[in-house]
């Protein structure tokens, strides 16, 4: 089939300018390999994995695909340097970050031939990581799921494109060929999608949860600060409504309880959790209350996206959920998006007088 050659496809060595984001509890080997084999860039989510689990996930992904893929890493995690060493040792093609990695980590990855692609939410952040040597950035507008900002993609994307000279990947509100064509027209090098890939055959999210997503409309997401203290776009559920109307003390008690569960699940020491909290506070403007509340995120997402408990869990989602009504394979999804984008780009060319 025809394809689209962009700065992203040239940089990473993938066939199509389509990225599957590193969603916690969702982006595992099966989904990442499915995306890679379909010609896109799949990214493993390591924030909800122990170091040993990440090792296994990389090995498993390599048995399922020989195509390039990436790993998303928490730059403020205490073991981030060890995880970066693992990526280098395993020749992982892309390292992505939700928070800007330190300049020396970027340099180390680049020296080893790993492509560095942080996610950013403002033009000033894009300029900073570009000056530090980042190869590209992913910029997510407010329509996107999970942690998100207040500015729509249609405004945030051009502001970032005007600020940096490295490839920019657009995220937030993308799901079809029209979106890809529009992003390329803005000057982006491709699109990144989370919710759209969550709703595919290769996604390991329980079918009952997928159908919960498919039943939702454009008005069925909300941006809540009660999940972890930061703006978090999620599906409207009874739990989220309850959290929104609960007092701060109740949220802190729940967060402390979930921190204990996360510690038990990962085998982390309390000293490591505290060290990560200190790093998080140093790298952001979060209060200690927000940092304690951040313990909510892994366990609440796990309850919904892994255990299928939509009553006790949180379901991160972009607004695009209201436009989705199918569960395609990654290949059918990417092939369809690219073919439609090419058709629409060709149609635009016909408008010239």
Swiss-Prot record:
Q: Where does the chain bind FMN?
A: 22-24, 171-173, 194-195
> Which SUPFAM superfamilies does this one have?
Inosine monophosphate dehydrogenase (IMPDH)
**Record's keyword annotation contains Secreted:** no
Reactions catalysed, semicolon-separated, are: (3aS,4S,5R,7aS)-5-hydroxy-7a-methyl-1-oxo-octahydro-1H-indene-4-carboxyl-CoA + NAD(+) = (5R,7aS)-5-hydroxy-7a-methyl-1-oxo-2,3,5,6,7,7a-hexahydro-1H-indene-carboxyl-CoA + NADH + H(+)
**Any GO molecular function:** nucleotide binding
Gene Ontology biological process terms in this record:
cholesterol catabolic process
Q: What class of enzyme is it?
A: oxidoreductase
Pathway participation: Steroid metabolism; cholesterol degradation
InterPro entries associated with the record: Aldolase_TIM, NMO
Q: In its keyword annotation, does this UniProt entry include Lipid metabolism?
A: yes
Q: What is seen without this gene?
A: Deletion mutant does not grow on cholesterol or HIP, but grows as the wild-type on pyruvate. In the presence of cholesterol, disruption mutant accumulates 5OH-HIC-CoA.
The EC number(s) this enzyme carries: 1.3.1.-
So which domain of life are we looking at? Bacteria
Assigned protein family: Belongs to the nitronate monooxygenase family.
Query: What does it do?
Result: Involved in the final steps of cholesterol and steroid degradation. Probably catalyzes the introduction of a double bound into the C ring of 5OH-HIC-CoA, leading to the formation of (5R,7aS)-5-hydroxy-7a-methyl-1-oxo-3,5,6,7-tetrahydro-2H-indene-4-carboxyl-CoA.
> What's this protein's name?
(3aS,4S,5R,7aS)-5-hydroxy-7a-methyl-1-oxo-octahydro-1H-indene-4-carboxyl-CoA dehydrogenase
Q: Origin organism of this chain?
A: Rhodococcus jostii (strain RHA1)
Q: Which gene encodes it?
A: ipdC
């Amino acid at each position: 089939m025809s394809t689209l050659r962009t700065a992203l496809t040239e940089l990473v060595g993938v066939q199509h300018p389509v990225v599957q984001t590193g969603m916690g509890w969702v982006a595992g080997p099966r989904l990442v390999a499915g995306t890679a084999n379909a010609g896109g860039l799949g990214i493993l989510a390591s924030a909800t994995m122990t170091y040993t689990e990440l090792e296994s996930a990389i090995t498993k992904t390599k048995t399922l695909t020989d195509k390039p893929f990436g790993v998303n890493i928490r730059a403020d995690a205490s073991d981030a340097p060890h995880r970066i060493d693992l990526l280098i040792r395993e020749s992982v093609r892309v390292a992505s970050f939700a928070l800007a990695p330190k300049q020396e980590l970027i340099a180390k990855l680049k020296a080893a031939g790993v492509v560095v692609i942080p996610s950013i939410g403002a033009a000033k952040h894009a300029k900073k990581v570009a000056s530090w040597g980042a190869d590209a950035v992913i910029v997510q507008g407010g329509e996107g799921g999970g942690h998100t900002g207040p500015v729509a993609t249609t405004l945030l994307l051009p502001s970032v494109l005007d600020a940096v000279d490295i490839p920019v990947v657009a995220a937030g509100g993308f799901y079809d060929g029209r979106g890809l064509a529009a992003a390329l027209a803005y000057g982006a090098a491709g699109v990144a999608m989370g919710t759209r890939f969550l709703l595919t055959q290769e996604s390991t999210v329980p079918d009952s949860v997928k159908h919960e997503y498919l039943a939702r409309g454009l008005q069925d997401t909300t941006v809540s600060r009660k999940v972890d203290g930061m703006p978090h776009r999620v599906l409207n559920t009874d739990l989220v409504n309850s959290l929104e109307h609960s007092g701060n003390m109740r949220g802190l008690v729940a967060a402390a309880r979930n921190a204990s569960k996360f510690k038990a699940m990962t085998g982390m020491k309390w000293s490591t959790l505290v060290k990560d909290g200190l790093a998080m506070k140093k790298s952001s403007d979060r209060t200690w209350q927000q940092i304690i509340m951040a313990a909510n995120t892994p366990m609440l997402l796990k309850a919904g996206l892994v255990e299928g408990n939509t009553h006790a869990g949180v379901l991160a989602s972009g607004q695009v959920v209201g436009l989705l009504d199918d569960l395609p394979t990654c290949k059918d999804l990417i092939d369809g998006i690219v073919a439609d984008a090419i058709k629409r780009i060709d149609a635009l060319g016909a408008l010239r007088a």
